[in-house]
UniProtKB/Swiss-Prot annotation:
Organism placement in taxonomy: Archaea, Methanobacteriati, Methanobacteriota, Stenosarchaea group, Halobacteria
Disruption phenotype: Cells lacking this gene are auxotrophic for thymidine (dT) and hypoxanthine. tRNAs of the mutants lack archaeosine (G(+)). A slight growth defect is seen in mutants grown at 45 degrees Celsius in Hv-YPC (yeast-peptone-casamino acids) medium supplemented with dT. Absence of pantothenate from the growth medium of the mutant cells results in a slow-growing phenotype.
Function noted in UniProt: Converts GTP to 7,8-dihydro-D-neopterin 2',3'-cyclic phosphate, the first intermediate in the biosynthesis of coenzyme methanopterin. Involved in archaeosine (G(+)) and folate biosynthesis.
Pathway linked to the protein: Cofactor biosynthesis; 5,6,7,8-tetrahydromethanopterin biosynthesis
Gene3D superfamilies: Urate Oxidase
Cofactor names: Fe(2+)
Native source organism of the sequence: Haloferax volcanii (strain ATCC 29605 / DSM 3757 / JCM 8879 / NBRC 14742 / NCIMB 2012 / VKM B-1768 / DS2) (Halobacterium volcanii)
Family per similarity comment: Belongs to the GTP cyclohydrolase IV family.
Residue ranges of the region described as Disordered: 282-308
GO biological process, one term: tetrahydromethanopterin biosynthetic process
Catalysed reactions, semicolon-separated: GTP + H2O = 7,8-dihydroneopterin 2',3'-cyclic phosphate + formate + diphosphate + H(+)
Keywords: Folate biosynthesis, Hydrolase, Iron, Metal-binding
GO molecular function (one): GTP cyclohydrolase I activity
Name assigned to this protein: GTP cyclohydrolase MptA
Site (May be catalytically important): C157
Length: 308
């Protein structure tokens, strides 16, 4: 005689508190991104998938739910997709439809993207990487999608550089160099300052697909720092990076503000309700701590601030 196993997850919990996110993390899938006239871009992606849980239900049927989640992701990644954020949106909507007790489904994805480029001075072919960030949240009211990336660059501290310039000015004055020549020299030869490896993150979230080019967001994030960095660097390239970084010294706060300004120019086709999340974290070279700044803001509010 067979026995039907009890559905413990559907029972009432001892503490009837609802949960905003229950699901799985670390789900790895191969993702193919279609490209017009080119071979598909294949990414090794890692997903996080969550639904909300009402207070009257003990659990989400984790074992069965994992099968549902796997089926949803497999269906989403097996169909041609041109945008990873749309794929996340499709997965979130499928997940929401399969859970009668949930009101919100969230799917997020990260993956390494290899970018081919040339070194700035020697013109040699090289590669860099960016971490793609994509997510979607589906509710009965619709689906919001997010796309962006985290990139690495170089920053130079303006305060440290200012102290070096002051010392250089004093030495040149002691050598009887006239003030005009000193200022011209300091203007043409940026003085040393302590540098950091910077991590810039930029994402855009809208109702439905953001209709934003991922490579534009990557360029904005890289250009918001003092200088771009490259894996391959001959001596002319090292000189180029070092000079331009010191000629464009920025605090961590400056990087986020540069991201805001560049984003406003590139995203002028989006509505005021689009949300931009900008984040900068710098690995300090002369401290054991790191520097951090960020801002999450609607494009409408950002437009008001920069137009003021």
């Amino acid at each position: 005689m067979s026995h039907q196993l009890p559905d413990v997850q559907a029972s009432q919990p001892d503490v009837t508190v609802g949960l905003s996110q229950v699901g799985v993390t670390g789900v790895e899938k191969l993702v193919k991104i279609a490209r017009d006239g080119k071979r598909p871009l294949v990414l090794m992606a890692e997903f996080e998938v969550f639904v909300d849980l009402p207070g009257g239900r003990k659990g989400i049927d984790m074992s069965r739910n994992m099968q549902v989640i796997d089926e949803v992701l497999e269906a989403a990644v097996s169909e041609p997709a041109y945008r990873v954020e749309d794929m996340c949106g499709d997965a979130a909507e499928r997940l929401l439809a399969k859970h009668e007790y949930t009101t919100t489904a969230e799917v997020s994805m990260t993956a390494e993207l290899v970018v081919r480029e040339d070194t700035p001075a020697s013109g040699l072919s090289t590669q860099s990487t960016a971490e793609i960030i994509a997510s979607a949240t589906a509710t009965d009211e619709g689906t919001r999608e997010e796309i962006g990336a985290e990139v690495v660059g170089m920053t130079v501290c303006p305060c440290s550089q200012g102290m070096s310039a002051s010392r250089a000015r004093d030495v040149l004055q002691d050598l009887a160099v006239d003030d005009d020549t000193i200022e011209e020299f300091l203007d043409k030869v940026p003085q040393p300052g302590h540098s950091q490896r910077g991590h810039a993150t930029l994402t855009v979230e809208t109702q439905g697909s953001p209709e934003v080019d991922l490579m534009d967001l990557i360029d904005i994030a890289r250009d918001s720092m003092s200088a771009r960095i490259y894996n391959l660097a001959k001596r002319p390239d090292e000189d180029h990076m070092t000079y331009h970084a010191h000629a464009n010294a920025k605090f961590v706060e400056d990087c986020v503000r540069s991201m805001a300004e560049l984003s406003l120019e590139a995203l002028d086709h989006l509505g005021d309700d689009a949300v931009v999340h900008m984040k900068q974290s710098n690995d300090e070279s002369i401290h054991q701590h790191n520097a951090h700044a960020e801002r999450e803001v609607t494009l409408g509010q950002l437009r008001d601030e920069l137009d003021a």
